[in-house]
Amino acid sequence: MSDSSERVVHLEKKSLKRVLGAAELFAIGYGDVGSSIYYALGLTALYALGATPIALAIAGLVFMCTSLTYAEMATTFPEPGGSATFSRYAFNDLISFIAGWGLLLDYIVTVAISAFAIPSYLKVVIPYPHSVSLNIAITIGIILLLYVINVIGVKHSGRFSLLLAIVTIISQAFVVLAALFLFLNLPYVLSHLKIGVAGADWSPNWGQFLKGTAMAMVAYTGIEAIAQLAAETRKPALTIPRAIKWTMGTLVLLYFGISVVGLSVIDPHDLGTKYIDNPVAAIVGNFPFGGKWLAPWFGLIAAIILLIAANAGLIGCSRLTFSMGEYYQVPRFLYRLHPRFRTPHISLAIFTVLAIGIVILSQGQLLFMADLYNFGAQIAFFSAHMSLLVLRWRKPSLSRPYKAPFNIPLGKNRSWPITALIGAMATLTVWFIVVFTKPGGRNLGFTWLICGILMYFFYRKKKQLPVTGQLSIETIKIPEYHPMELKHVLVAARILGNTDALQTACQLAHSFKAKITAVHVIEIPESLPIHAPFLKREEQGEAALKRAEAIAREYNLSIDLKLLRARTIEGALLELIASGAYDLVVVGTRKEEWAKKSSFALEIQRLLKSAPCRVLFCKS
């Protein structure tokens, strides 16, 4: 087996329906990306102070570069997986795993940080005493609620997302326009747009400003949400770039505008300390008029959009896990479906616990969660930019429905977009800022990364697949294939001198989480009454059923036991099958019973012919 490539054959399954248009895609993307301003603005102001608008503008420029990279890559490879998928095509499965694992951390922290920001905005609507432990408790309750909702399988509505996006955009635009025409103190804001000026009010030094810019990057993460939905998008070549450009333009303008308005009514120090948990509600609450009515409205809007963002993070975890599991990058049991609700309950439970763990570890510190967020997100973004650059060089003739603009020609039909170069350098720089200046995010981030890589190596070796190669999936169509389901297994508890049939039945019932019934049939000759006394046979039958019960206990199964009298085993089994919903009958036999003229062989033939369910014979 080569370590460079490996082919795995899978069954062809129904593909996701392409139902999302540009408007729905924009709404879902905006709901994920647009929620970040509600906690990122305060974090940015904490470091960037009066230069917060500049930090947001620089982060916005990087976001635009990243968005254009995703527009090209998601249309070239319209599959789930985002940066993990891009890296798999450009590099190999190990690099793809690192990108996906970083993105998975990003999604988990999205759940944690979005849910944690909700109580701070809710208290603007319904005032309650401030307490970090109470906020953590409410956050844990919100995350658990989202877990239950996702396990039950409540569907996310694209139309609801679109409506919420419209309401949010109108509300944020109103804030910017109202301030612009009525009370915006632009000279005051401009006077504080200074960096590294000693003695100037609210002027950060260059180190603080770089940290502030890194925090501002948190406001723009989430563009992966659109790439993850590429497989469900109508006409992805047109729809994805359009939705990404709408998201890009709307967010950059509104975020910059809100930061300018904010610094007109609140000094940067208060915005980054006193109001760090709910900066947007604080801004409208400090308006010279209408603030006490506007603040609760924005508190409610923020809480709803943050709840949707947290839910999107949990959904993103399961989607990404499914995509990575298809390529054997994470254990496939992670997306095993719930027997009743048909949802990936195991992966949802694991990510719920991890999100709650991050909230508890943070001890109510948004900064810690933001650092961890940046650690994972910048790995994903950097890998996306590098994937574009590598594929532009290695495969210049690859079909690209959309190409990022502003290209530098490199000869032989090759070119590199300036936007991808800027994006790659910027995202790597932000990641290094987290690594060298944020010990909390760095330590937990590297722990996550190392544990993931070890798991990946172990899993790939266990599956005898290459670690650094490029796994390719070949799908084949088998029309007659249908997933087998077993809900109730019937096993004949015969006295044979072996337990093969009982063990087989128990193993199948355990695997399919099915009920199991064991029956022992006392055969009564036609010449005798059906209730004729056969004490010895009854004792043997009870002993056989006890053996069946003991074996079932070894498989942690609860077993139903039946002792019946009948003329033939075949007749008793057929009568039982007719009266109960059995999917499978398991019967143990001895070699000599298969002789052509034996009475048992004839019974076997009749059972096979007449049974309405599957019949399995175990010959010892």
Question: Model-derived features: where do they sit?
Answer:
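Membrane-interface "cap" regions at the ends of multi-pass membrane proteins
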Residues: 1-51, 64-68, 76-80, 88-89, ...
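Helix-loop-helix junctions that connect adjacent transmembrane segments
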Residues: 11-12, 163-239, 243-296
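Extracellular loop-to-transmembrane helix junctions
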Residues: 17, 39-142, 247-251, 257
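TM-loop-TM module centered on a large, flexible mid-protein loop between adjacent transmembrane helices
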Residues: 92, 123-128, 196, 243-311, ...
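C-terminal membrane-solvent junction of multi-pass transporters and transport-like membrane proteins
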Residues: 160, 334-343, 381-432
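Small/aliphatic-rich secondary-structure junction motif
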Residues: 481-535, 551-553, 557-562, 610
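Structural beta-alpha unit
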Residues: 554-585
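Glycine-rich, Arg-bearing micro-motifs that act as flexible, cationic patches
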Residues: 587-610
